[in-house]
From Swiss-Prot:
Induction: Strongly induced by gibberellic acid (GA(3)) leading to an increased artemisinin yield. It comes from Artemisia annua (Sweet wormwood). PROSITE patterns: POLYPRENYL_SYNTHASE_1 (PS00723), POLYPRENYL_SYNTHASE_2 (PS00444). Pathway: Isoprenoid biosynthesis; farnesyl diphosphate biosynthesis; farnesyl diphosphate from geranyl diphosphate and isopentenyl diphosphate: step 1/1; Sesquiterpene biosynthesis; Isoprenoid biosynthesis; geranyl diphosphate biosynthesis; geranyl diphosphate from dimethylallyl diphosphate and isopentenyl diphosphate: step 1/1. Keywords: Cholesterol biosynthesis, Cholesterol metabolism, Cytoplasm, Isoprene biosynthesis, Lipid biosynthesis, Lipid metabolism, Magnesium, Metal-binding, Nucleus, Steroid biosynthesis, Steroid metabolism, Sterol biosynthesis, Sterol metabolism, Transferase. Isopentenyl diphosphate binds at residues 49, 52, 87, 104. This is Farnesyl pyrophosphate synthase. Mg(2+) 1 binds at residues 94, 98.
Amino acid sequence: MSSIDLKSKFLKVYDTLKSELINDPAFEFDDDSRQWIEKMLDYNVPGGKLNRGLSVVDSYQLLKGGELSDDEIFLSSALGWCIEWLQAYFLVLDDIMDESHTRRGQPCWFRLPKVGMIAANDGILLRNHVPRILKKHFRGKPYYVDLVDLFNEVEFQTASGQMIDLITTLVGEKDLSKYSLSIHRRIVQYKTAYYSFYLPVACALLMFGEDLDKHVEVKNVLVEMGTYFQVQDDYLDCFGAPEVIGKIGTDIEDFKCSWLVVKALELANEEQKKVLHENYGKKDPASVAKVKEVYHTLNLQAVFEDYEATSYKKLITSIENHPSKAVQAVLKSFLGKIYKRQK
């Protein structure tokens, strides 16, 4: 099946799930609440690239090694949408915490005049939709308990990663010397890699009847891939074109533990370090420009390109060491989607 067919079938599943959620018998909806949920879902869930969600279907298809039945397409898509729902929940709350302005090329949900802090409760609802979907469509499956457990564990890891990110960037305690590659890696591993990379493949493996405890090596490769993905994200936040990436980067203003600042501190001379310490994390454009100037002087674009090439080689080697050709195909498909991406 072509990727276009797959995407249109995937999007149809969203409509089905949304319809089930706004008619969930566990709550007495009226027109107002139904309309609110529908608008909130349409605004926050399907707007991204859908890579995480579609990856469940792709991965399952590669594991199966043949055409999928309508039921398999529906179930793998439903799991994919659970990840997109989880992602929407993280992003809605993340944008409030970061005081962001845009997301996916439109104003953040909480920035809409009628929404504001209602967005906090919407985030909780998005999170609660996941077990509703799992219960409705997977309760009779032998892997149901493992699925619920997987989503709970990954959510815990992601929230804990977000916590390290937030407490490392505490306002009033801006101390760049706390930042290092190892802290960056910990934040990335927990905040991004588990839910964006491991979760889609783990869902496909469970649906295929596999035991996740036997696939620790797959998890390790995917966490490495997630780290590489986040370094790309950090790079694009500063060097990407806002009209391409869909948002205006604010990592410098937000005092983020970005790969760029960690690398810059590693390579800078004393004078450049002083500029970084004095200007990183300040909102005014002049300070941001000074930080970017140091990045350019240190030629961080070339440093990143070197990192990208090395990471790619290492990942390919790890993938090709895996005994299963089907699993190799899943991992290579993932890597192919993100290698040298521009957004």
